[in-house]
Swiss-Prot record:
InterPro entries: AB_hydrolase_fold, Peptidase_S10, Ser_caboxypep_ser_AS
Family: Belongs to the peptidase S10 family.
GO molecular function: serine-type carboxypeptidase activity
SUPFAM superfamilies given in the database record: alpha/beta-Hydrolases
Free-text function comment from the UniProt entry: Involved in degradation of small peptides.
Reactions the enzyme catalyzes: Release of a C-terminal amino acid with broad specificity
One GO biological process term: proteolysis
Assigned keywords, A-Z: Carboxypeptidase, Glycoprotein, Hydrolase, Protease, Secreted, Signal
Species, as recorded: Arthroderma benhamiae (strain ATCC MYA-4681 / CBS 112371)
Its EC number(s): 3.4.16.5
Protein name per UniProt: Carboxypeptidase Y homolog ARB_06361
Known glycosylation sites: 108, 280, 316, 349, 441
PROSITE patterns xref list: CARBOXYPEPT_SER_SER
Record has rRNA-binding as a keyword: no
């Protein structure tokens, strides 16, 4: 059960006595306690801080891990970017060392190298492992709901701010993340703006990449056929199979919704029929977590390979649930060699660096450098993603209200907080068609959706536009043509420019 937060952080960070089993309030360590040693087998970087920090008001043993990197350029000293990975249950070190941090594993390298496209070039960057049990975040009692996740994170931020010279108040704070952080970011932003009297965070904007901002159906099945029609030849889908998928799509009414979403301005809200993936959520969650590997499909590993099986799987599956266009398509595609749901351009030469990341951060000398253990302590292996957290938070009973329904419109309309959505066109897991329909179904600042279509080009690479964009009434949307689910990894230079010019407005 969630424990109410009783702690009020003051500048001296003094505390009341603890109640048995709970850290109702604690004396906070000094900032110097988190200074890191130089990472083994890695280039030297500017001053940084890392470690675990207890969550006030929760069970003793529940803490979040953080890593704060200094700004590399004094011209951007006023900026603080907070990065959250998704999953749910995936470590922020995935983002830090595989995407946008000062050090990154490049290609087949087993040791981190300097990242020329580090976001620390644009300000201080704070990476947080959350919720408890994620990455290096410790867990005594696991979280069971998004409400608990957000409450813990907000309470933790209060402690972090007290230790680090009120950095959340004095810097321009931008919260950025990807995938399931599309849930985390709007909810924590909402908590921040509504509780400014408790912690006056100088929150300037939020940005979400390939994020789960809408209902599950809208994020996956609703846009799948629209996505497949763009890339049918690249994906080598036979005509009869494509027709069968389109049959299921039409039977569920998704094609009609997509057509309505193409009308600018929209003529009214869309009803999202069906509940994709409700029958066997754990199996589907595992499938998404592991990139649709055969062994992860379990009892749902039916591999529909004929038009008849495709149609049946979409409209009558006892495993995936009704209107499972996405799950059926992903199951079919999993039989193709070297297919990746995260970026359909990844081929057989693509190397997944997750095992390298886990091996490096499972080293005792690395964990000692990060203030996570003493030389005599037992080693705790590092896990990039925790499947138990994914299963818990993705369970139908635990899913929060999609941010596009209420939270995002409130942030934009009531609190006038700039919201930036960025998306990789090659991402099949959370496809851009579904994202665009979700935006067009959202009402903010007096109107529904974008009033004009997505047609402005941005960026140039080899005489071609990097993508298309639109911005209206405080919401911007950027579609990157050649990127997938992990955009900072796929297009590091282009995304760095995007963060500088769009998110930071510099």
């Amino acid at each position: 059960m969630h424990v109410a937060i009783l702690l009020a952080i003051i500048s001296l960070a003094r505390a009341a006595p603890s109640t048995k089993g709970y850290t109702v309030a604690t004396s906070l360590p000094g900032k110097s306690a988190f200074e890191t040693r130089r990472l083994p087998d890695a280039p030297e970087i500017l001053k940084n801080w890392a470690g675990r920090l207890d969550i006030p008001g929760t069970t003793i043993g529940n803490s979040l891990f953080f890593w704060l990197f200094s700004a590399e350029d004094k011209a951007y000293d006023d900026n603080l970017i907070i990065w959250l990975n998704g999953g749910p249950g995936c470590s922020s070190l995935v983002g830090a060392f595989l995407e946008n941090g000062p050090l990154r594993f490049m290609g087949n390298s087993t040791m981190p190298e300097r990242n020329p496209y580090s976001w620390a070039k644009l300000g201080h960057v704070l990476y947080i492992d959350q919720p408890v049990g994620t990455g290096f975040a410790s867990e005594k009692v696991p979280v069971t709901s998004n409400k608990e996740v957000i409450s813990n994170l907000y309470s933790w931020l209060m402690s972090f701010d007290a230790i680090f010279d009120h950095i959340l108040r004095t810097k321009k704070v931008h919260i950025v993340g990807e995938s399931y952080a599309g849930i985390y970011i709007p909810y924590i932003a909402s908590e921040i703006v509504k509780r400014k009297s408790e912690l006056p965070v100088n929150l300037v904007s939020i940005a979400i990449g390939d994020g789960t901002i809408g209902p599950n159906t809208g994020m996956s099945s609703l846009g799948m056929v629209g996505f497949l029609e763009e890339y049918a030849s690249k994906l080598r889908i036979p005509r009869d199979i494509m027709n069968a998928i389109s049959f299921g799509d039409h039977a569920c009414g998704f094609d009609i919704i997509r057509q309505r979403a193409k009308v600018y301005p929209p003529r009214g809200p869309f009803h999202l029929p069906g509940r994709s993936g409700s029958a066997n959520n754990t199996e589907i969650s595992n499938m998404l977590q592991k990139g649709v590997a055969d062994e992860s499909l379990g009892s749902c590993n039916i591999h529909p390979d004929t038009p008849e099986k495709i149609r049946s799987s979409i409209v009558n599956s006892t495993c995936y649930g009704h209107c499972a266009v996405f799950e059926t398509t992903a199951d079919y595609m999993s039989s193709q060699q070297c297919f990746s749901i995260y970026n359909i351009n990844y081929g057989c030469n693509f190397t997944n660096p997750t095992s390298t990341l886990e091996a490096y951060f499972s080293r005792s000398d690395v964990q000692i450098a990060l203030n996570l253990m003493h030389p005599t302590d037992p080693l705790r292996p590092f896990q990039s993603c925790n499947p138990k957290i994914l299963e818990t938070l993705m369970a139908p009973a635990n899913r929060p209200v999609p941010p596009s329904f209420e939270i995002l419109p409130d942030l934009l309309t009531t609190h006038k907080l700039p919201v930036h959505i960025y998306q990789g066109r090659l991402d099949m897991l959370i496809n851009h068609v579904g994202i665009e329909v979700t935006i067009q179904n959202m009402t903010w600042n007096g109107a529904q959706g974008f009033q004009d279509s997505l047609h402005f080009e941005f960026g140039r690479q080899k005489d071609k536009a990097v993508g298309l964009w639109n911005e209206e009434r405080g919401l911007s949307y950027h579609l990157f043509f050649e990127g997938g689910h992990f955009l900072p990894a796929d297009l590091p230079m282009e995304v760095l420019s995007y963060v500088k010019e769009v998110v930071l407005r510099q």
